[in-house]
Amino acid sequence: MSRIQQVNKSILIRSFCTGAPSKSNFSPVGNFLRIGDVVPDFSQDSSVGQINLYKTLGDSWGLFVSHPKDFTPICTTELGRLAKLKPEFEKRNCKILALSVDSVKDHLEWMKDIEETQKVKINYPIIADQDRKVADLYGMIHPNADNTFTVRSVFFISPDKRLRAQITLPASTGRNFNEIIRILDSFQLTDKYKVATPADWVDGDDCIIVPTVFDEDAKKLFPKGFPKIKSYLRVTPQPNK
């Protein structure tokens, strides 16, 4: 193994680049989850009744989103957009859960506004976390912020209940759900094949062969070929296309 391959192998193991979950259990630091942690289970009331996270997700992927407050403009557009995109998440075996610290009553009233203004029915549960139990577990409330506002976060949960990624935005900035689908596509691809996805990659684009794969093995794994730009930079067509 060359020095470059040794260095890159070390980087891949440390950086979680291949998407393989770590073996650590849930161990939040300062109420914040780390990539690879097992996410904490919970039961809480919601717009569809009492739900349990693990039972709801089953063996599916999970997209768990928090929003700052019901009856707010950006959140209204976000939850409407997410409802419209639900078929795309279903294609990827991914279930959606939303959360804020508002009541079930507020959720149900607000859902009427979303359906009226965004022209779509809310087709996933919205958790009512009035006691902040879940928000505190997942570090959704910034310590310097109003304690009745959860931050705008997205948690990607794999079928083995591990946190694969987290995106957090301020209340002023709405989420890009096309990017969220892109990230999910990347996880599902790189979990199955020895590739990583480069900058601006979207489903169907060329991929990068991970540096831990030797050229001899790459020839067998990637029969479509791989231009070798550098010893550590080998491009190949997306293997499942």
Curated annotation (Swiss-Prot):
Pfam family, one: AhpC-TSA
Positions annotated as active site in the UniProt record: C75
Entries under PROSITE patterns matching the protein: THIOREDOXIN_2 (PS51352)
E.C. designation(s): 1.11.1.24
KW Acetylation (keyword) present: no
Top EC class of this enzyme: oxidoreductase
GO molecular function, one term: thioredoxin-dependent peroxiredoxin activity
Gene Ontology CC terms: cytosol
BP term (GO), one: cell redox homeostasis
SUPFAM superfamilies membership: Thioredoxin-like
Reaction catalysed by this enzyme: a hydroperoxide + [thioredoxin]-dithiol = an alcohol + [thioredoxin]-disulfide + H2O
Residue ranges annotated for the Thioredoxin domain, each copy included: 33-189
Additional note from the record: The active site is a conserved redox-active cysteine residue, the peroxidatic cysteine (C(P)), which makes the nucleophilic attack on the peroxide substrate. The peroxide oxidizes the C(P)-SH to cysteine sulfenic acid (C(P)-SOH), which then reacts with another cysteine residue, the resolving cysteine (C(R)), to form a disulfide bridge. The disulfide is subsequently reduced by an appropriate electron donor to complete the catalytic cycle. In this 1-Cys peroxiredoxin, no C(R) is present and C(P) instead forms a disulfide with a cysteine from another protein or with a small thiol molecule.
Similarity comment text for this entry: Belongs to the peroxiredoxin family. Prx6 subfamily.
Protein name: 1-Cys peroxiredoxin
Naturally occurring in which organism (per UniProt): Dictyostelium discoideum (Social amoeba)
